[in-house]
Amino acid sequence: MHFLFFFANRQFLSLKCPQAEFVWIPHPVHGYITGKFIQEDYGGTSYCQTEEGESLSVACAPSQLAKVAKSVLDKSVDDLVQMDDINEAMIVHNLRKRFKNDQIYTNIGTILISVNPFKRLPLYTPTVMDQYMHKVPKEMPPHTYNIADDAYRAMIDNRMNQSILISGESGAGKTECTKQCLTYFAELAGSTNGVEQNILLANPILESFGNAKTLRNNSSRFGKWVEIHFDQKGSICGASTINHLLEKSRVVYQIKGERNFRIVATELVKAPPRSRGGGGSSPARPESFKFLSQSGCIDVEGVDDVKEFEERVLCHGQARVRVQFSEDDINNCMELISAILHLGNFEFVSGQGKNVETSTVANREEVKIVATLLKVDPATLEQNVTSKLMEIKGCDPTRIPLTPVQATDATNALAKAIYSKLFDWLVKKINESMEPQKGAKTTTIGVLDIFGFEIFDKNSFEQLCINFTNEKLQQHFNQYTFKLEEKLYQSEEVKYEHITFIDNQPVLDLIEKKQPQGLMLVLDEQISIPKSSDATFFIKANQTQAARSTQLRGGEDSRTDFIIKHYAGDVIYDSTGMLEKNKDTLQKDLLVLSESSKQKLMKLLFPPSEGDQKTSKVTLGGQFRKQLDSLMTALNATEPHYIRCIKPNSEKQADLFHGFMSLQQLRYAGVFEAVRIRQTGYPFRYSHENFLKRYGFLVKDIHKRYGPNLKQNCDLLLKSMKGDCXSKVQVGKTRVLYRAPEQRGLELQRNIAVERVTIQIQAGVRRMFARRLYKRMRAIKPVLLNAIKSRSLSVLEQAIDAAKDIEFDMKLIRDCKELRSVILKEMEITKKLTDYIGAPPNHKTYLQVEPLYAQLCAVLTEAESINYSTPLVETGQQIKYMIAQRVETREQLKQAVDGAVRVDLEAAIARAEQIGLEESEPTLAAGRQELQRIYREEELVAELLNALAVGMAMRTSETTWDHAAIDAHTLGSAIYAAESFGFRTEQGRLTLDEAKVIVEVRQHLAADDYESLSMTLKKATTTLNKNSMSQSTKTEIDEAYEELSHNTAVNDLIEKVVQAIQDHDQEMLDYGVQQADSLRITDRPEMMQATELLNRIVNARALLREGITNVDQAQLETALADAASFAYTREEVPTAQQLLDRIYVINHDADVGLYYMEKEPLERAWAGAQEINLKTAQIDEVRNVLANDEQKFIQEQLKTANRLGDQARAIRLNIKLKEIFFGQFGKMFVFEQFGGLRKPEDFAKAKLLGREALKLGMFKWTKSPIPTSLTTLDQLAVKSATRLFKNVLGFMGDRPLPYPNALAQDLLEQCLAAPELRNEVYCQIIKQLTENPSPQSVTKGWQLMRCCLQTFPPSEEFANCLEMFLAAKGKDDKYIEMLHDTQYGDKRTSAPNVEQILAAKQYVTRIDLNQSTQVDTSVVPQGFVPEKLIADDTEGVIRAGSRPAQARAQPGQQAQPAGAARQQAAAPVQAAAATASYDYGQQQQQQQQGYDQQQQAYGGGADYGQQQQQQDLPAEPTEEYKQVEVVYDYDGGGDAQRLVLVKGAIITVIKEYEGWAYGSTDDGQVGLYPINYTRPI
């Protein structure tokens, strides 16, 4: 491809270019590219070839092509002044290279170049901000924070107002730079009243009303000058905003592809009805409004308008409260915007009056809507928009009708006026909320964010004003950077190199000069001339500016267009409509109508005016120039700092750098000249006096050698300084000037000296505070000692109150408080005892005190708990003892009477007599009476037993009985006597029951009534206790049974055997033969015949019966084989076969279930075995496994998973065990009691003021940064923790910071890189979710929790507390699933994308707890029974969050305590832990117990952490333990429950296990340790 490129800057193309050397070739897209010169033609055109082989032609001689220094192409320089090879091409190349590396900021000395990346970069997090605040700015990369910091430091050091001028074309990123500067100031110099938050929170509201979507970007359509006020301490104390040139014409007209202001275009139409105020009837579709639909652009791609409205206007409650916007203000504001929209819908139709054209409103319903919203008369409104009142001096006012076009203009003017005044009111309202205190002495930093240079297809009055503003700012930059620079060097008589720059003063004269009239003045003049028009303006402008043909010339349309040569390029302006846009006057009668409105906000916007104010004409151009002059005056009174924003491409595309487009912006911004002047000039300068003040102290005692001449003093100081940094410093007539290298050297020396002095000052202040505290402690010590010695409550109270300001935790203060508590308790006990037993010596008797026995016991227990003993307490103990004896004796008597036991009753009566219980006592009288009754009952029992011993039937042979000897009458008489008396003793009742049964048996036998006898004997079986029967009763019942059985059996057997012989019923035959033998009837013919038949099949039947009865697999197989040998096919054979098949299935299920330890096959096997009564060793094991509770069963599954190497299953089971454990002991893991947290007192001490509030709110939501970390961290990590908390605040919206997702991303990346911060961040999120009053903040907090849970796990120690918090507060179980996935899944090495996490609608867990185990039956051995695992080597129980167990370790290695050792250790360890925990808080003991229980839940015994010994521990056990010496160092493997061993230490052994032991060290630490690291002493 060949093309001709004309390059204008010939000054750059000045280096001689030999042939075949690499040169910079001008390029229309990339600016410059590298290539080689090929040849030159006769016309002076050079032909080159790029490195990619592309041919290019350049209209210049070869000598004008700059040579490429290839050695520096790979360098990336962050300060263009420091470049070795400086030219346009190298500067553009350097910016492009840095842009590709996301290094969007580059310095030109103190000027910052900012290239818009069109994407989010992690450059604005609190961590980055903190680095710029706490490090030397020159050591940090270029950044907006550097500029802001320079401005702030200069304001503090010089006490001079500063300004930051942010310039660049539209879309270059000026507004973002402004936000970053304001955010930095808010963080660096935060106020006590939170005004800095007002500044940040007000910004979105201003953007809603002042930003709009343009063809290029979504940009500010107004300029703002934000002045931040600082008090004498450097803290923000107020702020103000001045708005410039709101583009109010956008309200009524937008060019194609652009939108109305954001609040108008989206936030009203798409807001819920409650935000529309009186405009609730507004159509919901934006197409219904002309002011929204005329440009054809309603929606913006990638922007959620409804969400934006909710966030910026409705839901940002914090912003509305801070800037003092009420709900009425919002509703009134929405009413006015709705009225503006409906004004745009007025449709005017033409009519004919008396020789004039008239107009009327076609859609009068719109007039009614607007009138309702504005609270004005509809008829008056319609009249005033269709006609105007003409007032001529000396004549009556006349109403003149308006044409449809004029009526539309009048309506548009009203809409613009309302919106413009509404915006001014908004700014005023915001300023009032941030106004500094009256009379306060302040310094300011102003930040200017104003519209960038604009060149559109159609440019009108708005673009002329905007570009005029940019010309002014460019002139300010030129004056400060170039003109004033050279002027200063000349006045100071310093050598310098002259720099040529683009001077835009002629363009400013063209626009604003008075003679000849500039374009703005011509516009103003034409407004006051009758019958003037855009055409007359165009003619007059060309006439007055004919002499400035270089800056102004005609356009393509010579009747309307003119071209101005701006510093940023030629702009074609269309004069059509300029006159009307410049008028900015509202028709008088519309103004009067507006002033008559009853709408609250309209009354404020249009207050009643007086006199000629109603008719005064103030042009928009005139207002604008006045504002601009005021702005320039303010800027000129400040020390400026510059940020030049560059737009790298017009497509707003990330990672796309158009070199030529950027090159043009750099040229117009004066960047290249700034680079050269910074290199050749002296950017750093001080007056002689200030130079001496700033650096004079670097040379000791130099002031003693000073003379009256300040210049000579400066020379003397520079010559006396060490090093060569002062050799190139220029001392001018009034100033000292020098370049960047000298500045760095001087500042380095000064910083070192200041730091040294600062350290000395800090040490002195700390020493002073320490001495003051020591004096207060010494002064309070005797007071505390006397108070303790006095044991006087009032004295103690006074001493404690006197010591309340002592910050140090003195033991004497603790002792006083403890003694006060003891004395208060003693007083309480004494008062209660006096109430109960009376004051000495008039004590009550124990009979009087007995009703208060329970209360007396309680108060004496309290006295015992504090070892409180006095005569009164001892008397109470004696009375308590006496009462207790009486109470116990009464209860003993009552129980003995109720039980009717003679021995107990006699003992109770004896005790009552011993303690002197009164005979009138009811329980004693009842006892004596019952004892007499028992004596009589025993006599009757003896008579009854005698009657039972005689009168039973006599056996005459083995099969016959004699009934003649039966006697039932005597026994019946004895029964009658017993029932009449009423037996109560147990022996009496049992004997009576026996007698009743026996008398019935005798009666039935005597009558040969065997059926009744059978029923009586059955009843005896249920009513009589065989073990307590008398021997005679047992004998008589047995005999009756035998007689009954024999008689029944003989008859039944003969009948059945006869039938069995007929049917060849083998089972009945077998039964008959056996019964005949027992009945002694084997010699009867029927039985002999049956025996002969039975012998034929008895063997086969016996085998089958045995196999089926025993459910024995081997017996069944043998019996079936035997039956098959002689073809026996009765029902036993198929039954046996079915049973054998079932056994095969059950055994297979048992094999699979035990091998894989899966419940389903185990339950099938057990159910089948129960059903058929199968009993084997394997089935016993199945029963034992299933008999375990859920926890124990999962432990067995966990062992199996480790045996099979199924890590995924082991993790799932581990989680289930945790769930069980938390169900039992979860309450012990309270977040506030996590051991890694700081104590609230320590947390509060990190701040000098407000400590009590900090202590109480340590675990509650706050909108302020925290003074230190929530967890115990080293000092370096504490700083990171406090910075990360700002990320949390910013993401949750509790503190306005830009780019919340970037804050979350930064937090995730830092926590991945620094594991020690992970617990801290989780604690911070939990803190911010606790008692948070904002639902939006809570939602964002859980989003941040979700991001963290999917990125990094907490520590093992904190995981339980976090999981319990998620279970209690999380909306669902997904948070716990995320935690488990992160704990047990693959660890991340890089942070996930926050936006992707938040965009995910559903979380898919990686660990499915319900996932079934994959079973391979081919590997299962038959008859499998799991062996008991050897605990020290093979157990694989994985603890939650811990590493798998290792094999036993050799010395120097780490090993996991075996499960068996843990289980055996449980009891003694618990006892030792209880001793070590004495004097600890209750919660600590519960939490320790919880950890122990958790370890048992995971299949092991309790792992116990190190327990610190406390004062006044109980005495150690007297049992002697053996001791061992440590021979190898052991670090505990990172497990806090094990001892850390140091070679040579002595351990007292409490208990030994397989490979491990439990013991205590000399300093009181207790825990497990490996035996092979020690040797016996």
Curated annotation (Swiss-Prot):
One term under GO cellular component: cytoplasm
Domain Myosin motor: 75-751
Low complexity composition bias: residue spans: 1444-1466, 1483-1497
Keyword Lipid metabolism among UniProt keywords: no
Residues involved in ATP binding: 168-175
Family annotation (Pfam families): Myosin_head (PF00063), MyTH4 (PF00784), SH3_9 (PF14604)
Domain SH3: 1519-1577
Region described as Actin-binding: 628-650, 730-744
Residue numbers bearing the N6,N6,N6-trimethyllysine modification: 119
Every MyTH4 domain range: 1261-1401
A GO molecular-function descriptor: ATP binding
Signal peptide: none
Gene3D superfamilies on file: 1.10.10.820, 1.20.5.4820, 1.20.58.530, Kinesin motor domain, Myosin VI head, motor domain, U50 subdomain, MyTH4 domain, SH3 Domains
IQ domain mapped to chain residues: 755-782
Subunit structure: Myosin I heavy chain is single-headed.
UniProt protein name: High molecular weight form of myosin-1
